[in-house]
Amino acid sequence: MLNYDKMEKIGEGTYGTVFKARNKNSGEIVALKRVRLDDDDEGVPSSALREICILRELKHRNVVRLYDVVHSENKLTLVFEYCDQDLKKFFDSLNGYMDAQTARSLMLQLLRGLSFCHAHHVLHRDLKPQNLLINTNGTLKLADFGLARAFGVPVRCFSAEVVTLWYRPPDVLFGAKLYNTSIDMWSAGCIFAEISNAGRPLFPGADVDDQLKRIFKQLGSPSEDNWPSITQLPDYKPYPIYHPTLTWSQIVPNLNSRGRDLLQKLLVCNPAGRIDADAALRHAYFADTSDV
């Protein structure tokens, strides 16, 4: 790491320690993500290196740039563009109120980043407010894109914090192993509701069972009628027939009817029925975004 001066530790990410650093040559501030691998004896898997090389090609204003990959001994250090805060910290600064224009701008940027990455056949698989970063001029950027495929999604973070289930779709909670872009669209829906409610999570489940119950109590329990092949999923088990008791206008009171319509198109239990990022960007909710 001869080219970088470490300034301070920013935190513990899902995959390892993150430092704020300065590029000695250019003076630019960057984020260094040091990836810890489960089996250090093995070194860095070639599959991980292949995936990471793909990520270097992702260049979009709503995706955090991966500038460089430094591979030494058993360590892999990823050099990313630096952002001041994540969406979770941004929520903390709001005092419980998010104005409609800011909410729409954040969601628009999230979907633009997703659309770009999905067009390049890269999934995120672990979207949450902690890996949506915001820089000083209010641009939202998706971080950690593709790392789940390169390194797997661990059950626990490097810091022993449990990886959250709050943004996982029902198909994944039921053990689905074949992912497509729909996994990210569900997460985007959960984040959309959280943005609208100024940081209050939509489905804050304690474990897989509680997570599924919370989802089905709001959306209604799925069945073979509205989700063919649900019973074939590896960890499927039947749940009671839940009927929603709260309306969407009660759950996201700050979201207008167009926003609620988009939210319901994102939060479809059957992955085949979920709206994709491009269609979401064409939704009427974004029709009046000349101000964004």
Swiss-Prot record:
Its cofactor is Mg(2+). The active site is at 126 (proton acceptor). This is Cyclin-dependent-like kinase 5. Heterodimer composed of a catalytic subunit cdk-5 and a regulatory subunit cdka-1. Interaction with cdka-1 is required for cdk-5 activation. Disruption phenotype: Several glr-1-dependent behaviors are affected including an absence of backward locomotion after nose-touching stimuli and a reduction in reverse locomotion. In L4 mutants, incomplete elimination of ventral rab-3-positive synaptic vesicles associated with a delay in the formation of dorsal rab-3-positive synaptic vesicles in DD motor neurons. Normal formation of ventral synapses in DD motor neurons at the L1 stage. In addition, mutants have an increase in anterograde dense-core vesicle trafficking and in the number of plus-end-out microtubules in DB motor neuron dendrites. The gene is cdk-5. One of its GO terms (molecular function) is protein serine kinase activity. InterPro entries: CDK (IPR050108), Kinase-like_dom_sf (IPR011009), Prot_kinase_dom (IPR000719), Protein_kinase_ATP_BS (IPR017441), Ser/Thr_kinase_AS (IPR008271). PROSITE patterns: PROTEIN_KINASE_ATP, PROTEIN_KINASE_DOM, PROTEIN_KINASE_ST. GO terms for cellular component: axon; axon cytoplasm; cytoplasm; dendrite; nucleus; protein kinase 5 complex; synapse. It comes from Caenorhabditis elegans. Binds 2 Mg(2+) ions. Mg(2+) binds at residues 131, 144. Proline-directed serine/threonine-protein kinase which, in several motor neurons, promotes the polarized trafficking of synaptic vesicles and dense-core vesicles (DCV). In the ventral nerve cord, phosphorylates lin-10 and thereby prevents lin-10-mediated anterograde trafficking of the glutamate receptor glr-1. Involved in the inhibition of glr-1 trafficking in hypoxic conditions. In DA motor neurons but not in DB motor neurons, regulates axonal transport of synaptic vesicle precursors by inhibiting dynein-mediated retrograde transport. One of its GO terms (biological process) is synaptic transmission, GABAergic. ATP binds at residues 10-18, 33. Belongs to the protein kinase superfamily. CMGC Ser/Thr protein kinase family. CDC2/CDKX subfamily. It is found in: Cytoplasm; Cell projection, Dendrite. Its EC number is 2.7.11.1. Residues 4-286 form the Protein kinase domain. It catalyses: L-seryl-[protein] + ATP = O-phospho-L-seryl-[protein] + ADP + H(+); L-threonyl-[protein] + ATP = O-phospho-L-threonyl-[protein] + ADP + H(+). Its main location: cytoplasm. Keywords: ATP-binding, Cell cycle, Cell division, Cell projection, Cytoplasm, Kinase, Magnesium, Metal-binding, Neurogenesis, Nucleotide-binding, Serine/threonine-protein kinase, Transferase.
